[in-house]
Amino acid sequence: MDHPPLQVKVVSADREVWKGESVNIIVRTTEGDIGLLPGHEAFLAALAPCAAQIITTDGNREVIACDGGFVALDNDGQVSIITQYATRSEEISVDQARRDRDSLRKKLNEHERSEQDPEVVQDLTHRLHLAQAQIAAARLAGKQRS
């Protein structure tokens, strides 16, 4: 049975990041990676920090770094990816993301050794995962430096 393309919206806290039609979406949930195709049953899951891949109807691949959130697919093929922070691969500075990752790793190690406030460690870990998702998104989009 032929199904119409998925209608996809990626929304962060401050903007609509991407909107369009897709024939395949690959995201990482807290349970593992999943692919969503037209005709997939309704679905709701918590996202892990990831590089979401959206294959458009014309065969292009949009790659978006997400810091977690939710992905929902309804019975009509409407997909919503809702996340606090999201960055399209073309907006990512790979060099900056790598510097952020390295700096956050160092800070995290220092805070863990000194047994700092768990909320500080949680915030640093969250920011580290976002930097890693940005690097992965840039890599998947074929962007090595910026």
Swiss-Prot record:
Q: Does the keyword Membrane apply?
A: yes
> What residue spans carry the region label Disordered?
92-120
| Record family assignment | Belongs to the ATPase epsilon chain family.
What topology does the record note for this protein and the membrane?
Answer: Peripheral membrane protein
Please give the superkingdom of this protein's source: Bacteria
User: Which keywords has UniProt assigned to this entry?
Assistant: ATP synthesis, Cell membrane, CF(1), Hydrogen ion transport, Ion transport, Membrane, Transport
State the gene name recorded for this protein. Answer: atpC
Localization, per the record, is: Cell membrane
Q: Which Gene3D superfamilies match?
A: F0F1 ATP synthase delta/epsilon subunit, N-terminal
Known partners and oligomeric status = F-type ATPases have 2 components, CF(1) - the catalytic core - and CF(0) - the membrane proton channel. CF(1) has five subunits: alpha(3), beta(3), gamma(1), delta(1), epsilon(1). CF(0) has three main subunits: a, b and c.
Where is this chain primarily localised? Answer: membrane
Residue ranges under compositional bias (Basic and acidic residues)? 92-116
One annotated GO molecular function is: ATP binding
Matching entries from InterPro entries are given as: ATP_synth_F1_dsu/esu (IPR001469), ATP_synth_F1_dsu/esu_N (IPR020546), ATPsynth_dsu/esu_N (IPR036771)
Q: What is this protein called?
A: ATP synthase epsilon chain
Task: Name the job this protein performs.
Answer: Produces ATP from ADP in the presence of a proton gradient across the membrane.
PANTHER family from the entry?
ATP SYNTHASE DELTA/EPSILON CHAIN, ATP SYNTHASE EPSILON CHAIN, CHLOROPLASTIC
